[in-house]
Regions:
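Exposed, low-structure sequence patches enriched in small/polar residues
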Residues: 313, 321, 391-647
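Catalytic-domain carbohydrate-binding cleft regions of carbohydrate-active enzymes
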Residues: 161, 179, 250, 255-256, ...
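Structural preference for beta-rich elements and adjacent junctions enriched in aromatics
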Residues: 1-345, 349-350
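Outer-envelope beta-barrel architecture signal
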Residues: 72-74, 116, 157, 174-178, ...
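Short beta-turn/strand-loop junction motif enriched in small, turn-promoting residues
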Residues: 164-168, 231-233, 365, 452-454, ...
Length: 647
């Protein structure tokens, strides 16, 4: 079948870099009711016209937005002209993920340098999502909330929103030029469009010119989240725990967060898949203290000098993070397990120009017999589509002595092509004790490249192919490993997605290979989909078969099921893992959930009731232990009561 012609992707000099949007102060704030009345937004700045975020092609449907502010709030409204029958609007709550929903998002960077930004999303039912600069834990009192009202219309949908200045990442009060963008996700195209086509370069986002940022009242208070937990087990063993999380905004745009006896009673740890690996794997971090401001603590990429999962037991912790000024970001953290371990982290990055960025970090582990220090100094320089980088890391360990890791490379990133050519060397004694660096003692040259296009083949939304090559030797010259891999994926307009993968290589004395094929339908609906992947492999001279099945199903508008099943046969030995999760909303702020985990012949389940996601007291009732290998007969109750403390 012949290719359809497609307009050429704009080069860097022809990006859709919009003119500054004047920051308009309104004397009469609009009413937030979802009705964009005639003349209601006439004082505001209005714009229209959106471009495909990946290709720069203009949208074939129309949308417009309004933006203004006063001393208390930022006001944002939008109207989308589309088929209302094709809208996806599953969510109706506040501060939730809007993935897969039709939505508009306002991206706002008050410092105006492209170092970060906050995002505020609204769907056609008025549900909201907040993604604040630096990362936040799911605590309404800390994240904040904003009001939005939306409605479907005969010509599409529209919304109005009021965003308090108090929840926006802080900037010094006074007149400034901020940066912004507006993104629009269309479920009928499974595609995202933006007001400015910048190829994801925030330094090129349009200016919101002449914003007079007000002094935010109330930021000098301590926000306290004390909690209490009581529980009883089958053997009548009584459990209890109390603790406190606290936060305060500091002068100059920094935030202070602390914890005493951290609240992780009902935190469900991530579950690792059954994938094969020669090296250690690390599950994701789910504890709120470490999630808060996590993007300010950058201690590496492939190798991380600090991995919070290494500090599994902490009694207290404190961190300070934020934007020191428009070009400088910092984070400082210390956690302690009294009588055993104190871990500390410092991270600093600076954007010297739109092209040049440098960063440094220092990590220290104070522990008897296990003392460790680690540091890094990184820099990158971007010219057009090409970025040159140098990453250096050093460690000094009480047992392993001194070591280093150095990576240098060049990245080319265009609308269709991505390529990364890198040289890496890691000494045998490189050892970040409270970090994550599973490979040591090698020199490697590697290349990864990917090519992809959108809407160039009839019936195909997007397709892509990738290739990776690498060769590694030990420091003494001995062979270590060679790898080659290829992948391909395609997403059809009917919602069906396919993927293929092949890899082959030699790891020390073993000759390995793997071939996989996967399918998802529909890939553009996170609430209702099925997926399957099967792989045929040979590792360590042994045959392996993997089968993974997954299901997401929206039983009712308030009930969601999620199921994943993994089956592995490795050299005649079988292994299985199943995770079943069911959630049901009793209201905007109430819900029940159930999780069942089966690992071979071990079963664990837990059920819970929650009253959370709103301002005020939160309550949780938990049956079982979510992180036990097998079922624990336990009944527990937790209460969290927010407070404020001013001086």
């Amino acid at each position: 079948m012949p290719y359809l012609p497609i307009a050429p992707v704009a080069p860097v000099n022809d990006l859709q870099l919009r003119e500054p949007l004047p920051a308009v102060v309104v004397s009469s704030p609009p009413t937030i009711d979802g009705e964009i009345g005639e003349g209601e937004w006439q004082e505001s700045a209005r714009r229209e016209g959106f471009y495909d975020r990946d290709t720069g092609l203009p949208s074939d449907e129309r949308a417009e937005f309004w933006l203004c502010y006063d001393g208390k709030n930022i006001y944002f409204a939008g109207r989308v002209y589309t088929d209302p029958k094709k809208l996806v609007a599953e969510e109706y709550r506040q501060n939730v993920s809007l993935g897969g929903n039709d939505q508009m998002r306002l991206s706002l960077d008050l410092l105006g340098q492209g170092t970060g930004g906050d995002e505020f999303g609204i769907n056609p039912r008025g549900a909201t999502e907040i993604e604040l600069n630096g990362g936040r834990a799911a605590k309404t009192e800390w994240v904040g909330e904003f009001e939005a009202q939306a409605k479907r219309t005969e010509t599409g949908w529209q919304f109005e929103a009021r965003i308090p200045w108090q929840i926006v990442s802080p900037a010094p009060a006074g007149l400034r030029d901020a940066r912004f963008d507006v993104e629009w996700f269309r479920s009928n195209k499974s595609n995202t469009y933006s007001y400015a086509y910048t190829r994801d370069d925030r330094t090129r986002n349009p200016q919101w010119a002449g914003v007079n940022v007000p002094k935010i009242e109330g930021n000098d208070q301590f926000l306290l989240l004390p909690y209490a937990f009581v529980g009883v087990r089958e053997d009548e063993k009584f459990e209890s725990q109390v603790g406190l999380d606290f936060k305060r905004q500091l002068p100059g745009g920094l935030s202070l967060v602390g914890t005493i006896n951290p609240d992780d009673v009902n935190i469900e740890n991530d579950i690792l898949s059954l994938d094969f690996s020669y090296f250690e794997r690390l599950a994701g971090e789910t504890r709120p203290f470490f999630q808060e401001g996590q993007n300010y603590f950058r201690t590496g990429f492939e190798a991380q000098l600090f991995a919070s999962q290494r500090t599994s037991n902490i009694d207290t912790g404190i961190k300070i993070y934020g934007d020191v000024d428009a070009t400088t970001r910092m984070g400082a953290l210390a956690v302690a397990d009294f009588g055993d371990q104190v871990a500390s982290v410092f991270s600093l990055s600076r954007r010297w120009s739109p092209q040049l960025v440098t960063s440094l970090a220092y990590v220290r582990n104070d522990q008897t017999g296990l003392y460790n220090e680690a540091g890094q100094l990184n820099s990158s320089y971007t010219l057009g589509d090409t970025t040159y980088y140098l990453l250096t890391q050093f460690t000094d360990d009480e047992q392993q002595r001194s070591g280093s890791r150095i990576s240098s490379g060049v990245i080319m990133d265009t609308a269709k092509w991505y390529a990364d050519l890198e040289y890496t060397e890691v000494t045998p004694n490189f050892f970040p004790r409270i970090g994550f660096a599973p490979e040591r003692d090698f020199r490697r040259v590697g290349l990864f490249t990917r090519y992809g296009e959108q809407l160039t083949i009839p019936g195909v939304l997007e397709w892509g192919v990738g290739l990776n090559l690498s060769s590694s030797h030990r420091f003494n010259g001995a062979f270590y490993r060679d790898d080659v891999g290829a992948s391909a994926d395609v997403s059809l307009l009917n919602g069906l997605g396919f993927s293929l993968g092949y890899s082959a290589g030699r790891f020390e004395q073993f000759h390995d290979r793997s071939f996989s094929i996967g399918a998802t339908y529909p890939y553009n609906d996170p609430y209702r989909l099925v997926r399957a992947e099967i792989a045929w492999s040979r590792f360590q001279d042994r045959e392996r078969r993997d089968l993974e099945l997954g299901l997401q199903y929206r039983v009712t508008p308030f009930t969601q099921l999620s199921l994943s099943n993994e089956f592995v046969e490795f050299d005649g030995d079988a292994e299985t893992q199943m995770v079943l999760v069911a959630t049901h909303d009793l209201g905007k702020f109430e819900g029940v959930s159930f999780r069942l985990v089966r690992r071979n012949y071990d079963y664990n389940w837990n059920a819970s009731y929650r009253l959370s996601g709103r301002r005020g007291t939160e309550m949780f009732l938990i049956v079982g232990d979510p992180n036990s290998r097998t079922f624990t007969n336990r009944l527990a109750f937790k209460i969290v009561t927010p407070m404020t403390l001013g001086f």
